[in-house]
From Swiss-Prot:
Keywords recorded for this protein, A-Z: Ribonucleoprotein, Ribosomal protein, RNA-binding, rRNA-binding
Record-linked SUPFAM superfamilies: Prokaryotic type KH domain (KH-domain type II), Ribosomal protein S3 C-terminal domain
UniProt xrefs under Gene3D superfamilies: 3.30.300.20, Ribosomal protein S3, C-terminal domain (3.30.1140.32)
Disulfide bridge map: none
Annotated region (Disordered), positions in chain: 211-263
Regions crossing the membrane: none
Top-rank taxon: Bacteria
Keyword Heme appears in the UniProt entry: no
Protein name, entry field: Small ribosomal subunit protein uS3
Compositionally biased spans, kind Basic and acidic residues: 219-240
């Protein structure tokens, strides 16, 4: 059976960039990578209500710069910036270096794969039917500009005895195309029946190697490709064009004079 490769790892150095951007020697690499994982887990738990999509970690010259992409930046910042100051203090204590925190707003959370997966997992934990949650998320994404979306849920769906996998797709999701801008996100719903995993792929169009969108190809519109027919009143005899004598295709040609009887 063919297995699905991670869309982001497949496109690294082509159209996507790393989420952790720093250099380290062989001895320090493992500890710094484990530190990044702890930071992301802490932010995911701390900012659960802030709809956090991506977290980018950079380490310039014995410092750390963390960029948090959130659909609700006001929840992260808090009143008069109190929450972000406490968050910065916790991150400095966790990483042991001065930390700068930047908050970026996600303009269209309905087309962000990670936010879609988190939203579906929260609905499943509230006992909402998984098909309804998946189809509603797909409709919202397509309505707001996504060219394709695929959602997969695995586990004891609706509390059945045997776990199964169900998926829905709308539009195009070209996973083999390197220039395709595929956004990928995963989440888990902890229900009373067990854990349900959610995977989301969102296709947002093609990208060039520098991350820019290519110019639109000049494709003829559907109306231009389709030949236009003349109105029925403008045709001779008011019939439809076509081969003579065909059923419903206009008048027959004048037949040859019938042979006289008796021949």
């Amino acid at each position: 059976m063919g297995q699905k490769i991670h869309p982001t790892g497949f496109r690294l150095a082509v159209t996507r960039n790393w989420s952790s951007r720093w250099f380290a020697d062989d001895k320090a690499f493992g500890s710094m990578l484990a530190e990044d994982i702890r930071v992301r887990e802490y932010l995911k738990k701390k900012l659960k209500s802030a709809s956090v999509g991506r977290v980018i970690i950079e380490r310039p010259a014995k410092n750390a710069r963390i960029t948090v992409y959130s659909a609700r930046p006001g929840v992260v910042i808090g009143k008069r910036g109190e929450d972000i100051e406490s968050l910065k203090a916790d991150l400095q204590r966790l990483m042991g270096v001065p930390v700068h925190v930047n908050i970026e707003e996600i303009r269209k959370p309905e087309t962000d794969a990670q936010l879609i997966a988190d939203s579906i997992s929260q609905q499943l934990e509230k006992r909402i039917m998984f098909r309804r949650a998946m189809k509603r998320a797909m409709q919202n994404a397509m309505r707001l500009g996504a060219q394709g979306i695929k959602i997969m849920s695995s586990g004891r769906l609706n509390g059945i005895e045997i776990a199964r996998t169900e998926w829905y797709r709308e539009g195009r999701v070209p996973l083999h195309t390197l220039k395709a801008n595929i956004d990928y996100g995963t989440s888990e719903a902890h229900t009373t029946y067990g854990v349900i995993g959610i995977k989301v792929w969102v296709y947002k169009g093609d990208m060039l190697a520098n991350g820019e969108l290519p110019p639109e190809a000049a494709t003829p519109r559907e109306e231009e490709r389709r030949p236009r027919r003349a109105p029925r009143g403008d045709r001779p005899d008011g019939g439809r064009p076509g081969r003579p004598g065909g059923r419903g295709r206009g008048p027959r040609k004048a037949d040859a004079a019938p042979a006289p009887e008796g021949e």
